[in-house]
């Protein structure tokens, strides 16, 4: 394999997982903070808020997993390999 393609694949894999983790990381922090604030304001709605929060966190985490899949594809099943 060409060393330039190898290097570009490694850099691309690093960028894909790094950039895929930034958005969900910020979103999860914001969502958790707002959930804690909502529970503090309305303790009787704790179960409903917690359920929605966990579902939202799972959807946000899926974006990071997609970035991981792209990174693994670039590293191990390199589509640019000739």
Curated annotation (Swiss-Prot):
Q: One cellular component GO annotation, for this chain's record?
A: chloroplast thylakoid membrane
Its membrane topology: Multi-pass membrane protein
GO MF term list? lipid binding; proton-transporting ATP synthase activity, rotational mechanism
The record's annotation in SUPFAM superfamilies points to:
F1F0 ATP synthase subunit C
User: What are the site positions for Reversibly protonated during proton transport?
Assistant: 61
Q: Quick check: keyword Translocase in the entry?
A: no
Q: Where in the cell is it found?
A: Plastid, Chloroplast thylakoid membrane
What domain of life?
Eukaryota
Keyword Membrane tagged: yes
Something else the entry says is:
In plastids the F-type ATPase is also known as CF(1)CF(0).
How does the record describe its quaternary structure? F-type ATPases have 2 components, F(1) - the catalytic core - and F(0) - the membrane proton channel. F(1) has five subunits: alpha(3), beta(3), gamma(1), delta(1), epsilon(1). F(0) has four main subunits: a(1), b(1), b'(1) and c(10-14). The alpha and beta chains form an alternating ring which encloses part of the gamma chain. F(1) is attached to F(0) by a central stalk formed by the gamma and epsilon chains, while a peripheral stalk is formed by the delta, b and b' chains.
Q: What is this protein called?
A: ATP synthase subunit c, chloroplastic
Q: From what organism does this protein derive?
A: Phaeodactylum tricornutum (strain CCAP 1055/1)
């Amino acid at each position: 394999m060409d060393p330039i393609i190898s290097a570009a694949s490694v850099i691309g894999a690093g960028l894909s997982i790094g950039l895929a983790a930034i958005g969900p990381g910020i979103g999860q922090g914001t969502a958790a903070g707002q959930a804690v604030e909502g529970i503090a304001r309305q303790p009787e709605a704790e179960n409903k808020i917690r359920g929605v929060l966990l579902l939202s966190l799972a959807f946000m985490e899926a974006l990071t997993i997609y970035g991981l899949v792209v990174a693994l594809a670039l590293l191990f099943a390199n589509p640019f390999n000739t």
